[in-house]
């Protein structure tokens, strides 16, 4: 039995979960999210208001999907109640970010500003010219947008310049030694 998969998913008040076969829809104060669970996994509502995720057999695929499916359902519930936020920061002389309407515009040392459009369900907030955050109810989408932004200018291992997650430790390299 999966250590994560066997834990029941608690559904807080104000959250409505509907299950239709393999489709799970979660409605909460922040919005609605839907997910299709992979075939061997079965999800059911319990009498005490929790959700149980079970697998029919001990095949390798079923074991692999058991804990994953439970965590994905938990992420839906957390998303519609609390939401997800990734805080990011920019290091480097002249590197900055600005909010243009709902979108972000970066100055990252290129000959042109780099715009990033806010997809549906994602909001950007700029705290200072070097600190910003990506927020939304879908954990996967927030993480993917954050990774795409980081990819614009990855942190340099020699000077540490670039876009990074808040608190991320960059492995620094020693430069060439002079004569």
Swiss-Prot record:
Record InterPro entries: Ribosomal_uL6-like (IPR000702), Ribosomal_uL6-like_a/b-dom_sf (IPR036789), Ribosomal_uL6_a/b-dom (IPR020040), Ribosomal_uL6_bac-type (IPR019906), Ribosomal_uL6_CS (IPR002358)
Domain of life of the source: Bacteria
GO molecular function (one): rRNA binding
GO cellular component entries: cytosolic large ribosomal subunit
Keywords: Ribonucleoprotein, Ribosomal protein, RNA-binding, rRNA-binding
Function recorded in the entry: This protein binds to the 23S rRNA, and is important in its secondary structure. It is located near the subunit interface in the base of the L7/L12 stalk, and near the tRNA binding site of the peptidyltransferase center.
Similarity comment text for this entry: Belongs to the universal ribosomal protein uL6 family.
Quaternary structure, from the entry: Part of the 50S ribosomal subunit.
The name this protein goes by in its record: Large ribosomal subunit protein uL6
Organism whose genome encodes this protein: Rhodococcus opacus (strain B4)
